[in-house]
UniProtKB/Swiss-Prot annotation:
It is found in: Cytoplasmic vesicle, Secretory vesicle membrane; Cell membrane; Cytoplasm. Belongs to the small GTPase superfamily. Rab family. It comes from Saccharomyces cerevisiae (strain ATCC 204508 / S288c) (Baker's yeast). The lineage of its organism: Eukaryota, Fungi, Dikarya, Ascomycota, Saccharomycotina. The gene is SEC4. It is a lipid-anchor. This is Ras-related protein SEC4. One of its GO terms (cellular component) is transport vesicle. Keywords: Cell membrane, Cytoplasm, Cytoplasmic vesicle, Exocytosis, GTP-binding, Lipoprotein, Membrane, Nucleotide-binding, Phosphoprotein, Prenylation, Protein transport, Transport. It comes from the Eukaryota. The keyword ATP-binding does not apply. GO terms for biological process: ascospore-type prospore assembly; autophagy; exocytosis; Golgi to plasma membrane transport; membrane addition at site of cytokinesis; protein transport; vesicle fusion.
Length: 215
């Protein structure tokens, strides 16, 4: 695995910022990655979200410990046919959010495979966070204690969230960004890349979009 290098950055419209953080959301299809991202960036919720095809990203600039930080947030497709495409985006990621659906035990079980993929393709310095989404649902099958236990086993922080109710959504991104900023401040991790404002979708293959429930 390669390390991350520093690049001084400023946006095209003349506004400067201290660093860019590239953050990925990964996990099985339908766990609500896109809904978490849209809730955080746009404060919107759509219960029937179009499944991500390939890669999508959004930008949000936030204040982290007094520093202006541009978050480049990448939403990856969870379907198996896109794994080769999406793993290419792990390199250079400063933070990775592993998401499962608390109403679907399979997505929880698969987190270990996602974690293995991260170890194979991401930088050693990347900060990780486990998220159990759809915590508002009464049909929960994965308990918070199970999530905590898995996070402890993997050695990473854990948060439960609901994109629908806007529970802990901001906490997810700010917690991870603060961990990254602490590494940057201690010179163990450094900002990378230049971001472009907006929402870009990269499609690949001949797969069709499909709707999935999003909470």
């Amino acid at each position: 695995m390669s390390g991350l290098r520093t690049v001084s950055a400023s946006s095209g419209n003349g506004k400067s910022y201290d660093s860019i953080m590239k953050i990925l959301l990964i996990g099985d299809s339908g766990v609500g990655k896109s809904c978490l991202l849209v809730r955080f960036v746009e404060d919107k919720f759509n219960p029937s979200f179009i499944t991500t095809i390939g890669i999508d990203f959004k930008i949000k600039t936030v204040d982290i410990n007094g520093k202006k930080v541009k978050l480049q947030l990448w939403d990856t497709a969870g379907q198996e046919r896109f794994r080769t495409i999406t793993t290419a985006y792990y390199r250079g990621a400063m933070g990775i959010i592993l998401v499962y659906d608390v109403t679907d035990e399979r997505t929880f079980t698969n987190i270990k495979q996602w974690f293995k993929t991260v170890n194979e393709h991401a930088n050693d310095e990347a900060q990780l966070l486990l998220v159990g989404n759809k915590s508002d649902m009464e049909t929960r099958v994965v308990t918070a204690d199970q999530g905590e236990a898995l996070a402890k086993e993997l050695g990473i922080p854990f948060i439960e969230s609901s994109a629908k109710n806007d529970d802990n959504v901001n906490e997810i991104f700010f917690t991870l960004a603060k961990l990254i900023q602490e590494k940057i401040d201690s010179n163990k991790l450094v900002g990378v890349g230049n971001g472009k404002e907006g929402n870009i979708s990269i499609n690949s293959g001949s797969g069709n979009s499909s709707k999935s429930n999003c909470c």
